Every structure is written in C-alpha cells, then in structure tokens.
Amino acid sequence: MRLSAEGLKDRAKWEEAGYALPKFDREKVTEATKENPFWIHFGAGNIFRAFQANVVQNLLNDGILDRGLIVAEGFDYEIVEKMNHPHDDYTILVTLKADGNIEKTVVGSVVESLTVNTENASDFARLKEIFAKDSLQMVTFTITEKGYSLVNGKGELLPDVEADFVSGPEAPKSYIGKVAALLYARYQAGEKPVAMVSMDNCSHNGDKLYAAINTFAEKWEENKLTDAGFRAYVNCKEKVTFPWTMIDKITPRPDASVEELLKKDGIEELDPVITSKNTYVAPFVNAEECEYLVIEDAFPNGRPELEKGGLMFTYLQSFDIILRETNNENHYCRSRSSR
C-alpha cells in the first residue's frame, strides 16, 4: 500500500485497513480547481494538512464544494518537492478522538502544490495565473507570526525586504514581497476583489498581514515600481480585505508511534524527511480532535459555505465574546480528551 494516486486505486485494501478515503471524483475536482481556483493557501505545514484540508475534504465528500485546494510553500520548498509531489498531494490524517480511539483518513482535497520561488519560473508564473483568476475568493496563510515581520530583532529591515523595496515586484526574494507581487498581479488583471486571510495563531493577525503588504505597496509606489493605484487597491475594503481569525488545533510533529501503527497496516514509504532547513515532515500528520477556526466575515469576492464544515464566521465586534466561548469549549474538550 502506497500513498499515491496509483496506490489508492485499490480502495478495498485501504478500507479494510480502516482508512476513510475521499468520496469525490478527484480527477474532476482537480480539473475544476485548476481552471477556476477559489482558495489558495500559503504554508504547507501540518496544521493546514490536518485542519483546513480536512474541512474541504468533508465538504467535497458531501457535495457542498466541487473544487479543492491549492497549496503554496514559501519557506521550505523541499516540503513540496519531497513530500507533496511524491505522494500526489495526498496526506494521511491520524486523529486522536476524545474517547481515545484513533481515526485514520486519507485526505485528497489538495490537488496542486507549488513553491513560492521566483527562481522557479513555471511555479511563479502559475501562481500569477491563479491570482489573476476571477474565481479566486480567498488567499490564506499559516506561515507563523514571524513570517509577517519585515524586520529583525533589532528593528532593522531584513536584507531581502530592503532589496525588494528597491527592485520591485518582478522577482522579489522575501516571502511577503512575493505575496505582494502576486497581489499586484491581481491588481493588474483588473483590480479583482479577494480576501487575504491570516490563519496563524497570533493576535490581530489580519492587521499584521495588512501592515506587511501595505508597506510593500507604499515603498513600490514611492519608488515608482508599480502603477500609482496599487496602494489604493490594497486599502480599498471593497477590493481587498484582511480578516482577523482565531484558530486552535494541536498538530505535533509526526509521531514515531503513529508511523509504526501505519506501517503495521501495510503502508510503505512512510519515512519522515528532515529538510535542509530542518523541517520535519512526513506523509502523515497526527492531531487531536478538538479544533476551532473563527473568521471575520469580510470576503469581497464571496466565499464558500465553510460554516457547513464547522468553521465559524462572525463580525469584528463579536470576536471577544466568541474568543471566550471557544476557549472555554476547547478547554473542556481537551480536559475530556486527556482523561
């Protein structure tokens, strides 16, 4: 048993071993997603694979969605090259249930994976193509709080950021510079609306993403490296929004005991990879069952019905109330799961 499109053709063997498999036509979903993408996510890490990707899978299984996810990795390209591509973007999700049982799911909602690398001409051209699509509704991020910072611990501009300010959006080197360049491509395609949604677990995450993107828009406009209207586009809430979110999902690094459990089921090629950037990644993710994601409902190009997958949408003034409620609920849930 191998985790790949070919290996999953023998569905009976996987199901006999207790794995829940995708119930949708993945080839059809892949084709529709590539033609009319609605959601691209930056950050191919464990929380995305265990949470957002699984939510979309459930909605695909239920026929609520007809398109899947595209993921882009901008910090460690080897995650895509050594894990996503060899396994055809499939992941095994192992969930520890509140009653102590284990649930095993093959997640296949991610149908395309790319590196956010301006030196990879085909990948970056594809990213620009995605950003130019009318259908794109949301661009989401789990890149850690540090990923939004343009300065070092001393408050000095990071070298790549400083270089990007003067070189412009053609071939930026910094992570946020690349994202800003992609948003500029959407602006050039007709000032199309989109929600830029940080899903990192940090306070006022939407403001952090906005501040970083807006700084690039300001500097590029000052240096006459973009059209004069780009900064206004970034600051027009009818065109571009930066919703706040709150997220909680425990996804520790891939566990050796989980790996052994899967190997006993007969699954091959499960060995984790430690990349040159010291990222520890495996074909599987292990996670606790408890989770929540609350999103400020500010989507200028519309959004899918993600509330049917368990996500919560609210308005900014309701965040404090929901934060207290979700924290209490999650504390209760964790207390039960630890018994």
Residue ranges of each PLM-predicted region?
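Substrate/ligand-engaging "lid" and interaction regions
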Residues: 1-42, 46-339
